[in-house]
């Protein structure tokens, strides 16, 4: 599954939820009628009578609130209690349904996660754990064995080369970036 969002808190009393968007194509992924898979085992209820998150959710409606928060209504989610039960659920699409980028300088998150990170001098630093999408620039989360994770801005000046075939990302970090 390719994660395209994480369901956040309910908005109002009619089942609408906030969604933390994790895709560059929210208008396509969250279009009315879109069927999204849910993370297996998401939000296992504490008692038998609790709402169980289904394996798929169908988007009924989606809209931007104040230009920055995506509000989504899913079919069958009719009140705040059910919306609250969805909180924290990851939603996504099958990787097979995602076309590869047409621009050679563009990558999907799942293509980068797990790649080795090396300096331009060839020193292995660790691997990419995930990509965080920040307002100014995307951030590569560098996981280093036995050390804290480091956020590396995904910009040409710091990440000059992505070698998917070779399974590596070459970085040229400015002084002190890896010490934070």
UniProtKB/Swiss-Prot annotation:
Q: Does the keyword Mitochondrion apply?
A: no
Subcellular localization, per the record?
Cytoplasm
Q: Which GO terms describe its molecular function?
A: ribosome binding
What's the chief localization of this chain? cytoplasm
Where does the record place the PRC barrel domain?
A: 104-177
Gene3D superfamilies according to UniProt: PRC-barrel domain, RimM
InterPro entries from the entry? PRC_barrel-like_sf, PRC_RimM, RimM, RimM_N, RimM_N_sf, Transl_B-barrel_sf
The alphabetized UniProt keywords are: Chaperone, Cytoplasm, Ribosome biogenesis, rRNA processing
Pull one GO CC term from this UniProt entry.
ribosome
Q: What Gene Ontology terms for biological process does this UniProt record contain?
A: ribosomal small subunit biogenesis; rRNA processing
Cysteine pairings via disulfide bonds: none
Which family does the similarity line name? Answer: Belongs to the RimM family.
Task: Describe its assembly.
Answer: Binds ribosomal protein uS19.
Q: What is known of its domains?
A: The PRC barrel domain binds ribosomal protein uS19.
The record's section on PANTHER family has: RIBOSOME MATURATION FACTOR RIMM (PTHR33692:SF1)
Function statement = An accessory protein needed during the final step in the assembly of 30S ribosomal subunit, possibly for assembly of the head region. Essential for efficient processing of 16S rRNA. May be needed both before and after RbfA during the maturation of 16S rRNA. It has affinity for free ribosomal 30S subunits but not for 70S ribosomes.
User: What is the name of this protein?
Assistant: Ribosome maturation factor RimM
Organism for this UniProt entry? Salinispora tropica (strain ATCC BAA-916 / DSM 44818 / JCM 13857 / NBRC 105044 / CNB-440)
Q: What is the lineage of its organism?
A: Bacteria, Bacillati, Actinomycetota, Actinomycetes, Micromonosporales
Gene name for this UniProt entry? rimM
């Amino acid at each position: 599954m390719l994660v395209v969002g994480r369901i956040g808190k309910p908005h109002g009393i009619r089942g609408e939820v906030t969604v933390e968007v994790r895709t560059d194509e929210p208008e396509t992924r969250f279009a009315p009628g879109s069927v999204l898979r849910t993370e297996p085992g998401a939000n296992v209820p504490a008692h038998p009578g609790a709402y169980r998150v289904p394996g798929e959710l169908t988007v009924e409606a989606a809209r931007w609130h104040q230009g920055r928060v995506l509000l989504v209504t899913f079919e069958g989610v009719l009140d705040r209690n059910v919306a609250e039960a969805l909180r924290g659920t990851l939603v996504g699409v099958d990787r097979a349904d995602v076309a590869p980028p047409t621009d050679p300088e563009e990558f999907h998150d799942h293509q980068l996660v797990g790649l080795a990170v090396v300096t331009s001098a060839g020193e292995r630093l660790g691997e990419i754990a995930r990509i965080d999408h920040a307002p100014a620039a995307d951030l590569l989360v560098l996981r280093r064995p036995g050390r804290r994770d480091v956020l590396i801005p995904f910009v040409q000046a710091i990440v000059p080369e992505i070698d998917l075939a070779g399974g590596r990302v070459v970085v040229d970090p400015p002084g002190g970036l890896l010490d934070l």
